Amino acid sequence: MALPEWLVKEIDGVGDHPAFAGVDELERGLRTLAAGYPEITTLRRVGTSRHGEPLLCLTIDGEPGDPTALVFGLPHPNEPIGGLTALHLAARLCADPGLRGRLRHRWRIIACIDPDGLRLNEGWLAGPFTREHYARHFYRPAGPETRWSGRSRWTTRTPTSTRRCRRRRR
C-alpha cells in the first residue's frame, strides 16, 4: 500500500539535525510554539519529574468533538529522536491549519516525558557519534519505564511520567 501524497510530502519536509535536542532545547521549542500560536495552543505544566524538572504539555486545539491524541517523546531517555519528532509534529500542526483539518484531532504533546533520564544522556547528544563516546555518556534507567509501567503486580509505584500521561484533562 502506497502512502498518500500529502504524507510523503510531510515526510520529505523533515529536515536534518546535526545533533539531538536536550531537555532545555525541547522545553524552549514548546514555549516558542505556545508564544507564536496563542490562538490555538496552551502550554501547561502537567507534572514534575523526580528531580524537579517540569513536565510540559502543549495542547493544540482541534474542532469541537475531535478526539484527543497524546504524543510523548523519550519514553526511553537514550532514544532522543522522539523529542525531535514530537517537536516537529507540534510545529507542523501549529503552522498548517490544513494539516490540522486533515488529521482532525486535539493534540497533547509532551516533548520529553523523562527529562531526568535525558539530562543523563546529554553528554552524547551533540556527538561525536562514535560507539566509545556514546558508551561513556549512555544512560538508561533500570527500573520501571513510562511506556509499560502501568498498574500491574510487578510494580508497586507508577512513575510520575506514566501517571501524567494517563491523567485525563478536559
Residue spans of the language-model regions?
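Hydrophobic side chains in beta-strands
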Residues: 59-60, 71, 111
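Short beta-strand element of the alpha/beta-hydrolase
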Residues: 67-76
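Active-site/substrate-binding loop(s) of hydrolase catalytic cores
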Residues: 66-67, 80-84, 88-170
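Gly/Ser/Thr-rich loops at beta-strand to alpha-helix junctions
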Residues: 49-51, 77-80
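Short beta-strand-to-loop junctions in surface cap/lid or active-site-entrance loops
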Residues: 57-65
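Short glycine- and acidic-rich boundary segments immediately preceding or forming the N-terminal edge
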Residues: 1-56
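Active-site-proximal beta-strand/loop segments in catalytic clefts of secreted hydrolases
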Residues: 46, 74, 111-114
